[in-house]
Design a protein with these regions (language model features):
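Formylglycine-dependent sulfatase
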Residues: 1-179
Length: 179
């Protein structure tokens, strides 16, 4: 990392904000590039696969016949990591897991300035959605489209929960949301 490249997390942390990262991280984890090295006080990211096991009864999967999709599905186990620590398996669908953790960050930091960078995996491949969300898409044609739409439904639910939490805590009016 060049010293003249400053992240928004570094700027806000220097200004007294608590900074948290939840989700995808595409800058790498070596040589000063991890979220904690880039200005985040705390970071929760998935370090293995980004989806529940294929045979999980609560989800529906959709696959594409492409080399990248095959590689992603074969890439490893569902595992998260907090601040570079040991890997652990989240107990639910990734969009819901990220959302629940984001709600905790908001709740725990409501009385001080905070910056939450929530980078959902949805609607990225591999395509996986909760069975309950896919069932709501029965009016659509095509298995992959139903699963993709189920992922959008979960993402929409996530944004709704976050906005609702901000309103419940009476901090919505002084919050900037970038989506």
């Amino acid at each position: 990392k060049r010293q003249d490249q400053i992240t928004i997390a570094e700027m806000l942390k220097d200004a007294g904000y608590y900074t948290a990262h939840i989700g995808k991280w595409h800058l790498g984890h070596s040589n000063g590039m991890s979220p904690n090295d880039q200005g985040f006080d705390d970071s929760l990211s998935l370090g293995g696969s980004y989806y529940l096991p294929e045979n999980d009864p609560n989800v529906v999967n959709a696959k594409f016949d492409t080399s990248i999709d095959k590689m992603i599905w074969a890439s490893g186990q569902y595992a998260a990591q907090f601040n570079g620590g040991d890997y652990f398996a989240p107990d639910k669908y990734v969009t819901d897991y990220y959302t629940d953790e984001a709600l905790k960050v908001i709740e725990n930091n409501q009385h001080r300035p905070f910056f939450l960078y929530l980078s959902h995996w949805a609607i990225h491949n591999p395509l996986q959605a909760l069975r309950s969300d896919v069932k709501e898409m029965n009016h659509m044609r095509g298995h992959n489209l139903k699963v993709y739409s189920g992922m959008i439904r979960a993402l929409d639910r996530s944004v709704g929960k976050i906005v609702e939490k901000l309103k419940d805590l009476d901090i919505y009016g002084k919050t900037l949301i970038i989506f």
